[in-house]
UniProtKB/Swiss-Prot annotation:
This is Ribosomal RNA small subunit methyltransferase A. It is an enzyme of class 2 (transferase). Its EC number is 2.1.1.182. Disulfide bonds: none annotated. Keywords: Cytoplasm, Methyltransferase, RNA-binding, rRNA processing, S-adenosyl-L-methionine, Transferase. SUPFAM superfamilies: S-adenosyl-L-methionine-dependent methyltransferases (SSF53335). Specifically dimethylates two adjacent adenosines (A1518 and A1519) in the loop of a conserved hairpin near the 3'-end of 16S rRNA in the 30S particle. May play a critical role in biogenesis of 30S subunits. InterPro entries: KsgA/Erm (IPR001737), rRNA_Ade_diMease-like_C (IPR023165), rRNA_Ade_Mease_Trfase_CS (IPR020596), rRNA_Ade_methylase_Trfase_N (IPR020598), rRNA_adenine_dimethylase (IPR011530), SAM-dependent_MTases_sf (IPR029063). It is found in: Cytoplasm. Belongs to the class I-like SAM-binding methyltransferase superfamily. rRNA adenine N(6)-methyltransferase family. RsmA subfamily. Coiled coil: none annotated. PROSITE patterns: RRNA_A_DIMETH, SAM_RNA_A_N6_MT. It comes from Photorhabdus laumondii subsp. laumondii (strain DSM 15139 / CIP 105565 / TT01) (Photorhabdus luminescens subsp. laumondii). It catalyses: adenosine(1518)/adenosine(1519) in 16S rRNA + 4 S-adenosyl-L-methionine = N(6)-dimethyladenosine(1518)/N(6)-dimethyladenosine(1519) in 16S rRNA + 4 S-adenosyl-L-homocysteine + 4 H(+).
Amino acid sequence: MNNRVHQGHFARKRFGQNFLTDQFVIDSIAAAINPQPGQAVLEIGPGLGALTEPVGERMDKMTVVELDRDLAARLQVHPQLKDKLTIIQQDAMTVNFGELSQQRGKPLRVFGNLPYNISTPLMFHLFSYTDAIADMHFMLQKEVVNRLVAGPGSKTFGRLSVMAQYYCQVIPVLEVPPTAFTPAPKVDSAVVRLVPHKSIPHPVKNIRMLSRITTQAFNQRRKTIRNSLGDLFTVEQLTELGIDPSTRAENISVEQYCKMANWLSEQPEMQS
């Protein structure tokens, strides 16, 4: 039997499809999400409905974003869900989550078993809508969850860690083995909860500046900051900001990155 076929659907590699089939894991995730009637619940990549069903049975209505036309068509005729679902057949990377929140008149509760091939860019897309999101629960590669929760000094601390923690409180929920999926992925998975900060702890004036600094620093993570960010800061400027010029990117805190971004935003040559 072809292990890429589940419930008559052939898992498409280009969409990174791995279908969740372990009922204990499914129930545990639904319990962690704890959806309540009247909330604006949205699922990204519902697939064959493994999570849609236990969440949907508690809701009067919910929204799903599904790129695969065959899976979207199956959901349209799902006996228990079809009257509850608003189906958006679209790439989640192009969805305006702010508009969806406005339409519902409340912040979104977003969840999904995210395709591993788009999970990181999709997280960055969602971070730009955190003012329209109440919380997010995602199944991701365990390695990605480790990066999301990592702190300074960890080898897994990187740009994703900084940007995620700038916007959200990041809470690991559950580890999931490959055997919970069909077809089984080659990596371990984990569920993470991201709760946007009600008030950003270390606000930056220009988020693009924070993105630029973290990209540049972590792209050259083996170098000291005086070298990787040498075109942006002098040794004296870094010292004045309370940052050791001889340290590396992974040893600088989120607060310190925000301090650097704000200082850079104030420089006349950066105003254009």
